[in-house]
C-alpha cells in the first residue's frame, strides 16, 4: 500500500519460486492529501475520513486474496503534515493497517531500487542518464555518467507544491502553464549551470505519478525506451486539452 500526495494505491503480488514476482491486482484511488498539507499545514478531517474508508476497502481486498503479509508506506503528504501522528493513529484504529512514513532519502532509495531492476539500466547509466523523481512536494535529480553517480540534488518544485504556490499568487488559470514553466525553468537553469555543463545525458528516466500513462500513449511496450521527440509530441497534444479531456485520454477518469 502506498499513500502518496495525489493518490492511494494497493498492489497485490503473487510470489513463487517458479513464477517469481507477479502483479495480480492494482487498485488506485485519487485522494489529494498534499493539497491540505501544503495549503493549511495539516490534513483535514474530511480527507482523513476518506483515507480511512479507502484503506478499509483495501483491507477487504487483501482479505479476499488471503494475503500473507503487507507493507504500507506513506511519504511527504503525511510526513509534512502537522497532524501526522493523529492521521497514522486514526488509520491504525479504524483499519488495522500500520503505516510506515518514509523519510525523503528512504523514499528515493526505494524508487531507485525499482528503476535499477530494469535490464538495460547499467547500459543507460554507463552512457549518461538522469533519474528524475517527481513527487508532490519536491523533485530529485540524480545524474549518472560512466556508470557512476555524478550528483544528486533535491529541488523544492513538486507538482502539488507548485500548484499551491500559484493558487496563492494568482487566480488567473490561463496563466498557470506559463507561470509553472517560469518557476521550473528558473530552478533547472541553476541546476544546469552548476552540474550539467560538462555532462552529456542520453537517457532520461522519470519516476512520478501518471508518467506511465503518458508514455503508454507513445509506445505500448514500456520495457523499452521512448524517443524524446515522440514523447514531446504527446505532451504538446495534451497541453491543448482541458483537465477532463486529459483524464479521459489517459484513462484516469
Name each model-derived stretch.
Residues 1-21, 123-152, 209:
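Gly/Thr-rich phosphate-binding beta-strand-loop-beta motif of the actin/hexokinase/Hsp70
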Residues 6, 68, 202:
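Short acidic/polar active-site loop segments enriched in Thr and Asp
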Residues 12, 36-65, 77-87, 92-126, ...:
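Helical "lid/coupling" subdomains associated with nucleotide-phosphate turnover
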Residues 19-24, 66-68:
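A generic structural motif
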Residues 21-31, 150-157:
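Short coil-to-beta-strand
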Residues 31-33, 134:
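Hydrophobic residues in beta-strands and at strand termini
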Amino acid at each position: 500500500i502506498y499513500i502518496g500526495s495525489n493518490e492511494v494505491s494497493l498492489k497485490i503480488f503473487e510470489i513463487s519460486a517458479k513464477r517469481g514476482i507477479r502483479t495480480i491486482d492494482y487498485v488506485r484511488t485519487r485522494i489529494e492529501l498534499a493539497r491540505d498539507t501544503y495549503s493549511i499545514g495539516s490534513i483535514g478531517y474530511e480527507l482523513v475520513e476518506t483515507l480511512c474508508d479507502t484503506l478499509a476497502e483495501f483491507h477487504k481486498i487483501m482479505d479476499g486474496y488471503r494475503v500473507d503479509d503487507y507493507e504500507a508506506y506513506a511519504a511527504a503528504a503525511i510526513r509534512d503534515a502537522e497532524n501526522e501522528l493523529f492521521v497514522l493513529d486514526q488509520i491504525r484504529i479504524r483499519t488495522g493497517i500500520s503505516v510506515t512514513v518514509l523519510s525523503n532519502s528512504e523514499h528515493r532509495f526505494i524508487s531507485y531500487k525499482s528503476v535499477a531492476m530494469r535490464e538495460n539500466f547499467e547500459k543507460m547509466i554507463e552512457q549518461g542518464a538522469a533519474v528524475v523523481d517527481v513527487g508532490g512536494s519536491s523533485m530529485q535529480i540524480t545524474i549518472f555518467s560512466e556508470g557512476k553517480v555524478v550528483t544528486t540534488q533535491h529541488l523544492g518544485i513538486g507538482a502539488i507544491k507548485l500548484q499551491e504556490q500559484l493558487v496563492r499568487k494568482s487566480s488567473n488559470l490561463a496563466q498557470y502553464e506559463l507561470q509553472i514553466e517560469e518557476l521550473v525553468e528558473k530552478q533547472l537553469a541553476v541546476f544546469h549551470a552548476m552540474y550539467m555543463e560538462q555532462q552529456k545525458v542520453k537517457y532520461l528516466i522519470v519516476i512520478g505519478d501518471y508518467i506511465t500513462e503518458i508514455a503508454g500513449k507513445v509506445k505500448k511496450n514500456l520495457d523499452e525506451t521512448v524517443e524524446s521527440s515522440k514523447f514531446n509530441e504527446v505532451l504538446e497534444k495534451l497541453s491543448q486539452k482541458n483537465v477532463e479531456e486529459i483524464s479521459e485520454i489517459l484513462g484516469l477518469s
